[in-house]
């Protein structure tokens, strides 16, 4: 297992990459997943980071954890810009990191689920200016906070 680190619009990202691509017979690439921990946009829950990422790595994914902005730094679509940039970077470096560029998923818990769902529907928002390169191919929403009004989470 190889570890890579990079920044996505200043958000630290760590990736867990399989380094056995030379031994793969059929495909030399793997699907990728970006994990977004929850924490009410106040913090990032440790139990929704490495344990989840390592489980997906065990299932054969190239796995990435993004420490998106929280607290006062989370305004003005900043976490969304960071996650969008992360997906774009995975596509740009797909060959180098042996990623299937058409199989990039984003998974999020709670506030991270909100962020994940937001990218799923707002990937083409003019403020992102990244086009389809930041569109995830799949979303995994784990108890996301996405309901407002009368039925909102309290």
Segments (PLM) and residue ranges:
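N-terminal cap/lid segment of alpha/beta-hydrolase-fold proteins
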Residues: 1-28, 80, 150, 154
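Hydrophobic/aromatic beta-strand patches that form the interior of the parallel beta-sheet core
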Residues: 4, 34, 64, 140-142
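N-terminal carbohydrate-binding/catalytic regions of secreted carbohydrate-active enzymes
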Residues: 17, 29, 44-48
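Short beta-strand element of the alpha/beta-hydrolase
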Residues: 29-38
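Short beta-to-alpha linker loops that shape the active-site pocket of alpha/beta-hydrolase fold enzymes
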Residues: 39, 62, 67-71, 145
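Catalytic nucleophile-loop/oxyanion-hole region of alpha/beta-hydrolase
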Residues: 45-46, 66-101
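Short amphipathic alpha-helix adjacent to the substrate-entry channel of hydrolases
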Residues: 46-64
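Primarily recognizes the serine-hydrolase "nucleophile elbow" in alpha/beta-hydrolase
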Residues: 85-154
